[in-house]
Amino acid sequence: MKDCCGGYESEELLMDFSGKDKAAYVQDTFNSIAKRYDVMNTLMSFGLDKGWRKKAVQTVEAKPGMTMVDICCGTAQLSLELAMTVGEQGQITGLDFSENMLKKAQENLAGSPYRSIIELRQGDAMNLPFADNSFDGATVGWGLRNLPDLEKGVQEMIRVVKPGGMVVSLDMAKPTMPGFKQGYWLYFNKLVPLMGKIWAGKAKAYQYLHDSAVEFPSQQELANIFARCGLTETRYQNLAGGVVAIVSGRKPR
């Protein structure tokens, strides 16, 4: 079929969840790759991931003293970037449903001066354990594509953000530059699973990361979903030629 990158032919993807529902499969997948997740992210992004996280923190309009939530926080790298901005008077809550990712997050926070303002919780992004209007803003990094119901996940983020607050997603996107996009998808289709096999011993897990990125909506489509869910000022910012994008919107005041 033609993929959503615009004309690059690939085999139709039917993600194999090994007899499990998507939520259980994704949870098992991230539990299995948690120990080497940060190293693999840096390798796959050629070290650009830190800068992308900083840009997401700017987009969510984090400021000193704010209270923010980081959904699908994983190893807490984005949570840490948020904490550096909100400072000691602020508070960050990171939520993830992978126990092993949260264990790795605890290790990452152990020597951080921001540990005291970051609370890590295991929970379900489809049913956030927070009251309405609890946070000044919400982020999700490389997480929405793993949810069984993307729109419900976005709606939950909107629910827990205060009126006027920002909802921000940082995730894989669909590059559009001719020539570049074909090379990128070849890299992501062939080399990323190979890297996962060599450095993490988890080729199948990294094949899922490829497949889920291909099936994830384009940055424009995700911005449209944000608007459909009720956010205003929806937009996207392409990073690295559209390989990654930040999609954002504001909860109406």
Curated annotation (Swiss-Prot):
S-adenosyl-L-methionine binds at residues 75, 96, 124-125. NCBIfam families: MenG_MenH_UbiE (TIGR01934), PRK00216.1-4 (NF001243), PRK00216.1-5 (NF001244). Belongs to the class I-like SAM-binding methyltransferase superfamily. MenG/UbiE family. Its EC number is 2.1.1.163. PROSITE patterns: SAM_MT_UBIE, UBIE_1. It comes from the Bacteria. GO terms for molecular function: demethylmenaquinone methyltransferase activity. It holds the Pfam family Ubie_methyltran. Keywords: Menaquinone biosynthesis, Methyltransferase, S-adenosyl-L-methionine, Transferase. Pathway: Quinol/quinone metabolism; menaquinone biosynthesis; menaquinol from 1,4-dihydroxy-2-naphthoate: step 2/2. It is an enzyme of class 2 (transferase). This is Demethylmenaquinone methyltransferase. GO terms for biological process: menaquinone biosynthetic process; methylation. It catalyses: a 2-demethylmenaquinol + S-adenosyl-L-methionine = a menaquinol + S-adenosyl-L-homocysteine + H(+).
